[in-house]
């Protein structure tokens, strides 16, 4: 096996707001896990390995197998391996980590938490593509959606804040970071989401195009003499923010450039906001109303301009108004809507690690 050199690997741990990082050279995932466990003891995070009650693994894709997080066994690993072609960059590495922990801590429950499973409650009318049906039967071509752990977490937290059962609420969750996806959550279940077979679909993002006419791929292949694979890479890595404002894919840099009069930075930000509003309107109609709109992730939590601009576009159709002073606060749990608002607007900082930990406790039956 090829050693993972220091430039590509770093040992990072966080505890109670503290963060330490050091470059290391390791041979493989097993070495990485052994080193991590050693560090946990050295830093007195645990006194011995017996104190570790469970391990949670963020895994990208479970195909259509698991509507919930699952205890990792040889059987569940084999099922996930069978859909590796749906997540070729992430799934194999995710499973190497699972196997390494199962070997290092054989008596401890390992729980797989999937980015896609929260969205498996969608109806066929929402997740199917109008392409030859056999593509779905043979290859699983359909909408899967991503960021599921985040959408699930903020839905639970919003219900808690509103002091209502999640099963009684219609929510639109807006996960807006370098990757962006929205989900329509009706009575506790996802009924639609913006990302598709891959995370490329939906809203324009930091480096991704979002939804485009699929014929663009063939058109550019012929015009630029490129392969479909090359164009796919450009749509994933060189589009969105970076496709317009060539200097950065960071929303903060684009806001600064916009303020300085950069027309393309201004345009792509407005395109993104419009697309978010389009989806919110669509989900409102599909769910027959909405009780709360939730912003989360880097942009959702820390970009007041984005929140304001989206809500301003929703004022006329839905009567949404937010407290502009409160909206200037970044990175905190906020209720931005007026007290008597029919549709609440919340900022809920996401915490995927906590959601994973909760699932480990629940699925692993840890008291």
Identify the role of each PLM range.
Residues 2-9, 13:
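Single conserved hydrophobic/aromatic residue that forms the stacking wall/gate
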Residues 39-53, 158-165, 280-291:
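Phosphate/pyrophosphate-binding loops at sites that engage ATP/ADP/AMP, CoA/4′-phosphopantetheine
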Residues 118-223:
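Glycine-rich phosphate-binding loop of actin/hexokinase-like ATP-binding domains
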Residues 266, 270-286, 291, 300-366:
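Internal helix-turn-beta structural module
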Residues 57-60, 176-178, 290, 294-302:
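Glycine-rich beta-strand-to-loop/alpha-helix junction loops that act as flexible
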Residues 186, 192-224, 233, 297-328:
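Catalytic phosphate/nucleotide-handling subdomain of diverse soluble enzymes
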Residues 40-90, 109-111, 117-126:
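Short beta-strand-loop/turn "lid" adjacent to the catalytic site in phosphate-handling enzymes
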Residues 233, 240-244, 251-286:
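Adenine-nucleotide phosphate-binding core of ATP-dependent small-molecule kinases
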């Amino acid at each position: 096996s090829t050693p993972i050199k220091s430039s590509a690997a770093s040992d990072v741990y966080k505890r109670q707001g503290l963060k330490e990082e050091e470059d290391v050279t390791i041979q493989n995932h097993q070495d990485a896990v052994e080193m991590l466990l050693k560090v946990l003891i050295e830093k007195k995070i645990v006194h011995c390995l017996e104190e570790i009650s469970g391990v949670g693994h963020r895994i990208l894709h479970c195909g259509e197998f698991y509507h919930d997080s699952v205890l990792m066994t040889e059987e569940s690993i084999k099922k996930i391996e069978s859909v590796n072609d749906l997540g070729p960059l992430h799934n194999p590495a995710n499973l190497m980590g699972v196997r390494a922990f199962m070997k290092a801590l054989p008596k401890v429950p390992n729980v797989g938490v999937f980015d896609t499973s929260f969205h498996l409650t969608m109806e066929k009318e929402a997740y199917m593509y109008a392409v030859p049906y056999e593509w779905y039967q043979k290859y699983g071509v359909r909408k899967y959606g991503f960021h599921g752990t985040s959408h699930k977490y903020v839905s639970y937290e919003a219900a808690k804040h509103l002091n209502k059962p999640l099963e009684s609420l219609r929510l639109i969750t807006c996960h807006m970071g370098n990757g962006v996806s929205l989900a329509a959550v009706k009575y506790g279940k996802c009924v639609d989401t913006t990302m598709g077979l891959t995370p490329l679909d939906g809203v324009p993002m930091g480096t991704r195009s979002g939804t485009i006419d699929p014929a663009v791929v063939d058109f550019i292949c012929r015009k630029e003499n490129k392969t479909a694979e090359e164009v796919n890479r450009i749509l994933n890595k060189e589009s969105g923010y970076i496709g317009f404002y060539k200097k950065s894919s960071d929303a903060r840099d684009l806001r600064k450039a916009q303020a300085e009069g950069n027309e393309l930075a201004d345009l792509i930000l407005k395109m993104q906001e419009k697309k978010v509003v389009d989806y919110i309107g669509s989900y409102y109609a599909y769910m027959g109303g909405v009780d709360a709109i939730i912003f989360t992730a880097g942009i959702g939590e820390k970009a007041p301009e984005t929140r304001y601009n989206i809500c301003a576009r929703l004022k006329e159709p839905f009567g949404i108004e937010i407290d502009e002073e409160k909206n200037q606060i970044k990175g905190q749990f906020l209720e931005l809507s007026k007290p008597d608002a029919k549709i609440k607007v919340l900022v809920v900082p996401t915490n995927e690690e906590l959601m994973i930990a909760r699932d480990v406790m629940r699925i692993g039956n840890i008291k």
